[in-house]
Amino acid sequence: MSVLTSLLLRGLTGSARRLPVPRAKVHSMPPEEELGIMEKAIGLTFCFVSLFLPAGWILSHLEDYKRPE
Protein backbone atom coordinates (compact mmCIF):
# COMPACT_ATOMS: atom_id res chain seq x y z
CA MET A 1 0.00 0.00 0.00
CA SER A 2 2.76 2.45 0.86
CA VAL A 3 4.65 1.71 -2.38
CA LEU A 4 1.54 2.46 -4.39
CA THR A 5 0.95 5.66 -2.43
CA SER A 6 4.53 6.84 -2.92
CA LEU A 7 4.36 6.13 -6.67
CA LEU A 8 1.08 7.99 -6.93
CA LEU A 9 2.41 10.99 -5.02
CA ARG A 10 5.62 10.98 -7.05
CA GLY A 11 3.56 11.01 -10.24
CA LEU A 12 1.47 13.94 -9.00
CA THR A 13 4.35 16.05 -7.78
CA GLY A 14 6.79 15.15 -10.58
CA SER A 15 5.16 17.44 -13.11
CA ALA A 16 5.06 20.31 -10.63
CA ARG A 17 8.79 19.98 -9.99
CA ARG A 18 9.63 20.68 -13.63
CA LEU A 19 7.66 23.93 -13.88
CA PRO A 20 9.89 27.02 -14.05
CA VAL A 21 9.41 29.49 -11.24
CA PRO A 22 9.36 33.07 -12.57
CA ARG A 23 11.73 35.44 -10.81
CA ALA A 24 10.34 38.69 -9.49
CA LYS A 25 11.84 41.68 -11.25
CA VAL A 26 11.94 44.07 -8.33
CA HIS A 27 14.63 46.71 -8.35
CA SER A 28 14.95 49.57 -5.93
CA MET A 29 17.33 52.43 -5.61
CA PRO A 30 19.06 53.58 -2.43
CA PRO A 31 17.24 56.33 -0.54
CA GLU A 32 17.82 59.87 -1.71
CA GLU A 33 18.72 60.97 1.82
CA GLU A 34 19.46 59.00 4.97
CA LEU A 35 17.24 59.24 8.03
CA GLY A 36 18.78 61.24 10.82
CA ILE A 37 19.09 60.21 14.45
CA MET A 38 16.23 62.49 15.49
CA GLU A 39 13.89 61.08 12.83
CA LYS A 40 14.71 57.53 13.92
CA ALA A 41 14.16 58.43 17.58
CA ILE A 42 10.79 60.04 16.82
CA GLY A 43 9.70 57.00 14.79
CA LEU A 44 10.72 54.52 17.49
CA THR A 45 9.05 56.63 20.19
CA PHE A 46 5.83 56.80 18.20
CA CYS A 47 5.84 53.02 17.68
CA PHE A 48 6.52 52.41 21.37
CA VAL A 49 3.75 54.77 22.49
CA SER A 50 1.18 53.51 19.99
CA LEU A 51 1.76 49.86 20.95
CA PHE A 52 2.47 49.88 24.67
CA LEU A 53 0.40 52.80 25.95
CA PRO A 54 -3.01 51.21 25.21
CA ALA A 55 -1.83 47.83 26.53
CA GLY A 56 -0.55 49.43 29.73
CA TRP A 57 -3.79 51.34 30.23
CA ILE A 58 -5.86 48.18 29.85
CA LEU A 59 -3.62 46.24 32.22
CA SER A 60 -3.72 49.00 34.83
CA HIS A 61 -7.55 49.16 34.66
CA LEU A 62 -8.09 45.40 34.57
CA GLU A 63 -10.12 45.45 37.77
CA ASP A 64 -12.64 47.82 36.15
CA TYR A 65 -13.35 45.30 33.39
CA LYS A 66 -14.21 42.41 35.72
CA ARG A 67 -17.89 41.69 36.16
CA PRO A 68 -19.27 41.98 39.67
CA GLU A 69 -20.46 38.66 41.02
From Swiss-Prot:
It is found in: Mitochondrion inner membrane. Residues 1-25 form a transit peptide. The gene is COX8A. The chain crosses the membrane at residues 37-60. Its main location: mitochondrion. One of its GO terms (biological process) is mitochondrial electron transport, cytochrome c to oxygen. Keywords: Membrane, Mitochondrion, Mitochondrion inner membrane, Transit peptide, Transmembrane, Transmembrane helix, Ubl conjugation. It is a single-pass membrane protein. This is Cytochrome c oxidase subunit 8A, mitochondrial. SUPFAM superfamilies: Mitochondrial cytochrome c oxidase subunit VIIIb (aka IX) (SSF81431). Component of the cytochrome c oxidase (complex IV, CIV), a multisubunit enzyme composed of 14 subunits. The complex is composed of a catalytic core of 3 subunits MT-CO1, MT-CO2 and MT-CO3, encoded in the mitochondrial DNA, and 11 supernumerary subunits COX4I, COX5A, COX5B, COX6A, COX6B, COX6C, COX7A, COX7B, COX7C, COX8 and NDUFA4, which are encoded in the nuclear genome. Coiled coil: none annotated. GO terms for cellular component: mitochondrial inner membrane; respiratory chain complex IV. Residues 26-36 are mitochondrial matrix. Residues 61-69 are mitochondrial intermembrane. Belongs to the cytochrome c oxidase VIII family. In response to mitochondrial stress, the precursor protein is ubiquitinated by the SIFI complex in the cytoplasm before mitochondrial import, leading to its degradation. Within the SIFI complex, UBR4 initiates ubiquitin chain that are further elongated or branched by KCMF1. Pathway: Energy metabolism; oxidative phosphorylation. Component of the cytochrome c oxidase, the last enzyme in the mitochondrial electron transport chain which drives oxidative phosphorylation. The respiratory chain contains 3 multisubunit complexes succinate dehydrogenase (complex II, CII), ubiquinol-cytochrome c oxidoreductase (cytochrome b-c1 complex, complex III, CIII) and cytochrome c oxidase (complex IV, CIV), that cooperate to transfer electrons derived from NADH and succinate to molecular oxygen, creating an electrochemical gradient over the inner membrane that drives transmembrane transport and the ATP synthase.
